[in-house]
């Protein structure tokens, strides 16, 4: 009986290449995500610092405005 070559060896190599490519994409995606997270964290920290500065300067006005609007 004749045996057929299904090219299985090439498919295995293709899978390894695909896995390597996927790993590279995941690594670059993870580094992009990390950079984005750091940038957003810096932005949030900056905004919170700005809010703190405003509250320190205008704390009394802030409290009066809050109470007048129905805050407790």
UniProtKB/Swiss-Prot annotation:
There is a cross-link at residue 72 (Isoglutamyl lysine isopeptide (Gln-Lys) (interchain with K-? in acceptor proteins)). Residues 32-41 have a biased composition (Basic and acidic residues). Is modified by deamidation of its C-terminal glutamine to glutamate by the deamidase Dop, a prerequisite to the subsequent pupylation process. Residues 1-41 are annotated as: Disordered. One of its GO terms (biological process) is protein pupylation. Residues 28-66 are annotated as: ARC ATPase binding. The modification Deamidated glutamine is found at residue 72. Signal peptide: none annotated. GO terms for molecular function: proteasome binding; protein tag activity. It comes from the Bacteria. Strongly interacts with the proteasome-associated ATPase ARC through a hydrophobic interface; the interacting region of Pup lies in its C-terminal half. There is one Pup binding site per ARC hexamer ring. NCBIfam families: pupylate_cterm. Protein modifier that is covalently attached to lysine residues of substrate proteins, thereby targeting them for proteasomal degradation. The tagging system is termed pupylation. This is Prokaryotic ubiquitin-like protein Pup. It comes from Parafrankia sp. (strain EAN1pec). The gene is pup.
């Amino acid at each position: 009986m004749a045996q057929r070559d299904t090219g299985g060896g090439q498919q295995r190599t293709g899978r390894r290449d695909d896995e390597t490519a996927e790993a590279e994409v995941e690594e670059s995606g993870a580094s992009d995500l990390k950079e984005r997270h750091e940038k957003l964290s810096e932005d949030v920290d900056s905004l919170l610092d700005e809010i703190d500065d405003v509250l320190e300067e205008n704390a009394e006005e802030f409290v009066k405005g809050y109470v007048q609007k129905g805050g407790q």
